[in-house]
């Protein structure tokens, strides 16, 4: 089911939007490993946003124990506005990515075309939603997402069997969720 050979995006007028979205503005056309390039593009965009919304976020801001993207309080687990914005972006990218991935898959005749990386973007952002906005933690988030996306532990591989864009997107969202949970544990101790 993991049919990811190299190919080019759909280029017809009705599918141009799907090719642009599906490749995440061309990141999926980079070689080798278009999925990794899609994840790196997602990470770079997320870090750019983190620097804009958390000015001065190089290293000293979390020394007080206050985390910029989530915190435990008397009322429970609280997410910051940047974490919530990241989760909203995941929802929007998924809503747009499912039909785009479906269209590109139909056009290419492949179940999961390698150049479609919008799924990696959604999954990577899901892992990054609770990440500390610094490079060491962001790179760990990248590695965790790629690990779960490539190895596809249970039940991620089963999600690939869903039809069209659903299977393309949901297995990466599950990998992103696995990465988020492991990153949450790692950040508790690091």
Where are these regions (language model features)?
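Active-site-proximal helix-loop elements at catalytic-domain edges
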Residues: 1-7, 134, 141
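Juxtamembrane boundary at the C-terminal end of a transmembrane helix
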Residues: 184-190
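Membrane-embedded alpha-helical segments that form the functional core of polytopic membrane enzymes
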Residues: 78-100, 131, 135-144
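Short Lys/Arg-rich amphipathic alpha-helical segments
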Residues: 30-49, 85-89, 93
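Interhelical loop and helix-boundary elements at the membrane-water interface
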Residues: 2-41, 75-79, 96-127, 147-177
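Membrane-interfacial segments
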Residues: 53, 57, 61, 104-112, ...
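Interfacial segments of multi-pass membrane proteins
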Residues: 40-53, 125-131
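Membrane-interface interhelical connector segments
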Residues: 54-79
